[in-house]
Swiss-Prot record:
GO terms for biological process: translation. Signal peptide: none annotated. It comes from Pseudoalteromonas atlantica (strain T6c / ATCC BAA-1087). Pfam families: Ribosomal_L27. Keywords: Ribonucleoprotein, Ribosomal protein. The keyword Flavoprotein does not apply. This is Large ribosomal subunit protein bL27.
Length: 85
């Protein structure tokens, strides 16, 4: 006769895999065309000069140069640009 009740099941114990979002190249860093600058959900950062935007809102460099972050416009939006070196 068992003197302890059998362990029950639980509904916890799951979590989704992290998506590795965020800034990949910071202001002042040199980049090559095609380098990913920011991975994001939605447009937390907007594409500035010499920047492309993917269907998942990833920002990437269209030309070689240095990364530049700036806040501009009436809504204080964050823009990322590539400035020629």
């Amino acid at each position: 006769m068992a003197h302890k009740k059998a362990g029950g099941s639980t509904n916890n114990g799951r979590d989704s895999e992290s998506k590795r979002l965020g800034v990949k190249r910071y202001g002042g860093e040199s980049v090559l065309a095609g380098n990913i600058i920011v991975r994001q959900r939605g447009t937390r950062f907007h594409a500035g000069n010499n920047m492309g935007i993917g269907k998942d809102h990833t920002l990437f460099a269209l030309s070689d140069g240095k990364v530049q972050f700036e806040v501009k416009g009436p809504k204080n939006r964050k823009f990322v640009s590539i400035v020629a070196e």
